[in-house]
Amino acid sequence: MVKKIIAAIFMAMACSCSHLDLKGMFMPTGEGVEKRFEQSKEMNEDLKNGYVQTQESYAFYVATDPHIDETHKNLGTFNDAFRNDKGASFGVILGDCIDVKDNLPVYLEALSYSPEKHTCDHKIFHVLGNHDLFFNGWVNFKELVGPSVYWFEAIFDGGKDLYISLDTATGSLGRTQTKWLNSFLQENRSGYRHCVILTHTNFFYTDNSQASSGNMPMEESMALMDLFARHNVALVLQGHDHYREDLTFGKVRYTILGAIHDSAAAPEYLKVNVSSDGLHLDWQLI
């Protein structure tokens, strides 16, 4: 452990101050999860973040961990594919959007719609990741992107699907968000065909691999998995650890995406096809 800390300090000294938040490597910076949840509610009292009008069968695109610094080639590939697919209804980025201080506008520009290049101006939903908190990044995120906790609907003739974005950027939902999630699912889940959870930090990797954010405590993960099973959650989409894993626990599918950032060994994204028969995952390697 001491050797790891010394190595991290050497890395920090060797890097530009705009590329590495030394304080953020060892302790969370900015607001904690309780404050972020409270501020998300101030932005949207009921935490609803709109809806998408779609067909009974539709698709959406997902990527994670772009870690935008100087380049964003892979994210551009994702954006072009997603915005030229007329069968898609929306996109999702599962967090760790940036790696450089104040780089969020570059990230958002990389995901923008261009009428010269794209046929579809689809909406993109963003999840907060631990790297997005570095350099007190929550200030920019909430201003330029919006809340870290929210839900939205995909509405079609005769029904609708539910999508919930959770804030796990510091390795826990916290007390207030957990209480809200339990109540929200209890009161609302039965009104939807499918329910999909969007989160940055995954629930299965227990090693403290990501410095200040860590990973979810096992006890919290087990409680959430029980909650999702009881409320018939169809799919939990996760990122954070830069590798792909796809498994089922308690009849709930948990899918961890590999990173899409330009230096990833095997960058990828996911197209999810949704219908009354369920959700089909179509992996796309870049």
Annotate each language-model stretch with its function.
Residues 19-105:
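N-terminal active-site segment of His-dependent metallophosphoesterases
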Residues 60, 91, 163, 195-196:
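Hydrophobic beta-strand anchors of alpha/beta hydrolase catalytic cores
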Residues 2-8:
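Sec-dependent signal peptide recognition
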Residues 15-16:
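C-terminal motif of bacterial Sec signal peptides marking the signal peptidase cleavage site
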Residues 65, 95-96, 129-130, 200, ...:
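Active-site glycine-centered loops adjacent to acidic/histidine catalytic or metal-binding residues
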Residues 27-48, 52, 103-194, 214, ...:
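Extended active-site neighborhood of metal-dependent phosphoesterases/phosphodiesterases
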Residues 282-286:
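Short, solvent-exposed aromatic-acidic interface loops
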Residues 188-208:
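Short acidic, glycine-rich surface-loop motifs adjacent to enzyme active sites
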